[in-house]
From Swiss-Prot:
The keyword Membrane applies. This is Endopolyphosphatase. GO terms for molecular function: endopolyphosphatase activity; exopolyphosphatase activity. Residues 591-625 have a biased composition (Basic residues). PANTHER family: ENDOPOLYPHOSPHATASE (PTHR10340:SF55), SPHINGOMYELIN PHOSPHODIESTERASE (PTHR10340). It is an enzyme of class 3 (hydrolase).
Amino acid sequence: MLPKTLTIWASLASLAVAQSGQVVFAKNADGKFVHSTDDLDQGQRKIRGKFLHITDIHPDPYFHVGAVAEDKCHVDPDHKDSDYPDEDSELVWFRATGKKKHNHHKGKDHEKMPKAGYYGHPLSSCDGPISLMNATFDWIDQNIRDEIDFIIWTGDNVRHDNDNRYPRLEQDIFGYNQIVSSKFHELFRYNETRDGEGHNGGGDPQHPLVIPIIPSLGNNDVFPHNLYLAGPSFQSRRMLQIWSEFVPEAQQHIFSRGSYYFQEVITGKLAVISLNTLYFYKSNPMSDGCDEKTDPGYKHLVWLGVVLDEMRQRGMKVWLSGHVPPVEKNYEDSCHLKLAYWLTEYRDIIVGSVFGHMNIDHFVVMDPKKIEKAQSQDLGTPGLGYKSHVTDFLDVAISASHPVHTFGSIYKRNYIESVREDYSEIPGPKKWLDEYASNFAIAHVSPSVIPNYFPSLRVWEYNITGLGEEIGNPPHPPPSFRAWSDVLEEFERDYAQDVMDEIEVEWFDANSDVIEAEDNDGDDDEDENEDDPEMLTEEAIKEGVANINPETGTLASIFGGLKFWKSSTAVATSSEPESDDYDSDLDAERKKGKKKGKKGKKGKKGKKGKKKKGKKGKKGKKGKRDKSMPPKFPKDLQPGPAYIPQLFTPIGYTQYYANITQFNKEYKKTGASNFEYVVEYTTNDAPYNFEHLTVRNWVELARVLGKNFRDLDLEAEKSKSDQLWKVYMDRAFVGTGAEYLEEPDDD
């Protein structure tokens, strides 16, 4: 059983050491991976400068060897293997029952249809068998377990809901998230034999993980798929229980409300942020963009800003990770644009971003100004869409109906072709912000374990030169920063206050006519303060706020059910701010309106002034900085590791794949196979020949790949571009040849 909380770690000592010129790290009592100059014998692991990105495992307990792709590699529920003990058991069952053609195979001869093998069915819409998941973890254990520093795991740990004979239930969702999480726990829990002395053996739930593991929520990890509410909810609490060892204790409160968090993988130096991309996802009907404070996506971006700003102050660097990649076909327009700005305006600390979901291997060049321009030009109205509305709506429809995430191979090929067109529109160096191309950011999309093509894994390598010296010689005295729990509590409090302010403004604006009518009916000779509309407004707001229950529904995620709720309402309903930094424009407008009201008490003009006051307050509120948008990049800072080679700059990655077509044949013949992941390509080799993976290198590669669209008359360049594009397409579909398919891979 997995522990339900992280409190069992309280007795662990701080573990870490820098020795022999190598950085060593392990967990402390707070569950953080830390470094130290103290020579300890517990849980020591050298930092290798590598990490694993794994995504979209999709284990399917109903996967059946010998089944066909059109049945999602499932057999009929009344089928029994024991009756027909044959490797191709479904085919035997069909023959024995006289059902040569399946009733939903549309007249196709079942015996001639390709059958699922032991490790899966490539180039199909089938999920992966349990045998593939087990073989994948075995290979990781035997080959890279001791060579990586952390794991970014970008979700989708459950089969698709694509077969109404086997409907997914909520307990299935949690069950397989638990199973996949347990695989990581078993493999990376401290083991005395492999990881050194200091513990009583491996496998005990009280022993910590030896490296950080950072999972993200996938669109198939929720019930129903794609649909995810703002928390706290049963689902968010259950996922927190399953991921309790992955989510730092100080952030569990935030996770229960938004299912996003971060881990410091090298404390004080490097972190990984796990985004909940379902709040940005077009196919999530419970999310409506990132423009309103009541949108969970808006709050998510505000949280992201708080975390990035704090990390900038601490001198840290950070990777962003998530399930759904930031492309216009996937994201709500406002979320797409705002995230692009966050990626570029924090270019001093963001090292890169990695995603899954699409099962194909490619990268996205993000240019926020281009995105903004395209959105504003669409039908002449900002925010209505990027490029074609029709295309967006079709994409959403395909996403909802097609079993393979967004679309099948033929659609993905068309998508990749559109990516090339996007590459062709990237401007040359003369129009870049600087020589580092720092007005761009790169989102990396990794292929998946699920064998829609071939199962894949990606191992990144990053620069750790000088890291040992930095850790071994900390500044004197070391800087002191607030605890993350304090930072995040302040975020919740400030966000609740912002929403309270907006409630006041909107209430006043909606009721200003009523207030004016009551004011007109009043006696001009009465005491100046008696039944003053200003006072009536204050009392009405207090009454309205008092009726809000922040512990349930949407408001629970906004206000967080925090203990400071009463103090927050006190501040919000007071006519004077309780602190000097209270920046509500409405208070200032109230003061002005009150003075105008006194001067014009006996005339309508003065009362009209009060009516205008509400409008001014609303306008002033809108005029405040949108916290879901980043501030401008400080002029005194330089671009960071993503742009200029330095500590933590990505050096390259190795893409691995497993040719399960070959391994399926071996298993069918002998009942065993030499299953393995082998190198498909590395970014250091031809034709990329990257020395490091800076943004400029990716932008230049994209421009070469897009050359055919822009310079049709330059035959030599076109030829070079086409040759490179063929390599790119082959890698996009993991060497399966899917780019040459003429028909969709399933109906």
